[in-house]
Regions:
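N-terminal entrance/gating region of PLP-dependent enzymes' catalytic architecture
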Residues: 1-53
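Cysteine-centered functional microenvironments
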Residues: 20, 24, 52-56, 122-126, ...
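A generic secondary-structure signal for well-formed alpha-helical elements
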Residues: 23, 44-48, 73-80, 162
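Short acidic-aromatic active-site loops that bind/stabilize oxyanions
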Residues: 25-37, 59, 63, 96-100, ...
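Conserved beta-loop-alpha segment that forms the PLP phosphate-binding cup at the N-terminus of a helix
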Residues: 37, 41, 55-86, 106-111
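Generic hydrophobic alpha-helical segments
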Residues: 44, 69, 73, 137-141
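PLP-dependent aminotransferase-class I/II
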Residues: 78-85, 89-151, 156, 163
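Catalytic PLP-binding core of fold-type I/II PLP enzymes
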Residues: 165-169
Length: 169
């Protein structure tokens, strides 16, 4: 069971988000929303018993969070992509994103949107409980490294939409 934005709490959250109508990602553009986000993340940090170094950003959907996480991974792997992009680049080799066969379709979409291409996404086989098989992941990464492919990210799933399976993270 997954709560949706059409649930009671979801409707209230959507109401508040639309009423604020801000991007809280930068203090400069929206100081009050950024402060609210910091307080909320502090509560989450306390509830989960995480260290003070835990930081984050609140997104409206998991799809956007995945897109931004993969964009950050791409930026870290190829810092010049921000200025020069990926098109026609001969100075970087192929990049690879790994995820399970049960991953949400937003991962496919993010890989395409970020200009990595569908060939950059490797879907790892799952076990009988629909969880990513760690040994298959290790083998895929080793084979790619041997072939000159740079691992960019591993996207684990915590509760697939079809089976609620959780990858062994």
């Amino acid at each position: 069971y997954f709560a949706i934005s059409g649930s009671g709490p979801g409707i209230l959250a959507e109401f508040l988000a639309s009423a604020l109508n801000v991007q809280a990602m930068l203090w400069r553009t929206s100081p009050s929303a950024t402060e609210l986000e910091e307080v909320t993340l502090g509560w989450l940090r306390q509830l989960m018993g995480l260290s003070e170094s835990f930081e984050g950003v609140i997104y409206d959907t998991a799809s956007i969070a995945s897109l931004h996480a993969l964009a950050a991974a791409r930026q870290r792997a190829v810092p010049s992509v921000r200025v020069h992009g990926l098109a026609g680049r001969t100075d970087i080799g192929p990049l690879r994103v790994y995820t399970s066969e049960q991953a949400h379709s937003s991962i496919d979409k993010a890989v395409m949107t970020l200009g990595l291409g569908q060939d950059a996404l490797r879907k790892i086989p799952v076990d009988e409980d629909f969880r990513l098989r760690p040994q298959a992941l290790r083998s895929a990464i080793a084979a790619d490294l041997k072939s000159g492919i740079t691992p960019l990210a591993v996207v684990a799933t915590v509760g697939t939409t079809s089976t609620t399976s959780i990858d062994p993270i």
